[in-house]
């Protein structure tokens, strides 16, 4: 059975995890809140508390990634109220753990903010034109 780890089981990651379980996948899910652990477990998701920081990643990351073939990175940059956070540094600290584990495929969930506010049809070929700090950091 394919094991998938979803880093960030919030408004998008949690329903994604439940849908993957229904398709027969084994799913690990992360949250930053102890309050959400029970809900993840009740849904059949193997829950983990994982904290990504600009300086380090929590020790739980190794067990979270262990035996997973696919990693879905689904965490927001959280820059609306705090433009001083460095989302790129957080992802850079995650990379060595991914490189050392069994993950062979990574899906990074981004945001339409990397395209700016042109209100045009967007495809994968659309040039990036971020107009916010979050969009700029995601575009990196």
Explain the meaning of each model-derived region.
Residues 4-8:
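Conserved N-terminal Rossmann-fold NAD(P)-binding element of oxidoreductases
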Residues 131-140:
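Active-site Tyr-X1-5-Lys
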Residues 29-35, 51-53:
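N-terminal Rossmann-fold cofactor-binding loop
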């Amino acid at each position: 059975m394919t094991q998938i780890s979803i880093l960030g089981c919030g408004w998008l990651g949690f329903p994604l995890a439940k849908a993957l379980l229904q398709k027969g996948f084994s799913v690990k899910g992360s949250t930053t809140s102890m309050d959400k652990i029970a809900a993840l477990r009740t849904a059949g998701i193997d829950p983990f508390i994982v904290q990504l920081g600009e300086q380090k990643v929590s020790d739980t990351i190794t067990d979270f990634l262990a035996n997973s073939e696919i990693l879905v990175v689904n965490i927001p940059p959280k820059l609306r109220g705090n433009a001083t956070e460095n989302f790129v540094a957080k992802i850079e600290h995650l990379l060595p753990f991914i490189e050392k584990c069994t993950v062979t495929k990574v899906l990074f969930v981004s945001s339409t903010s990397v395209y700016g506010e042109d209100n045009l049809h967007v495809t994968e070929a659309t040039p990036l034109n971020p107009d916010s700090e979050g969009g700029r950091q995601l575009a990196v």
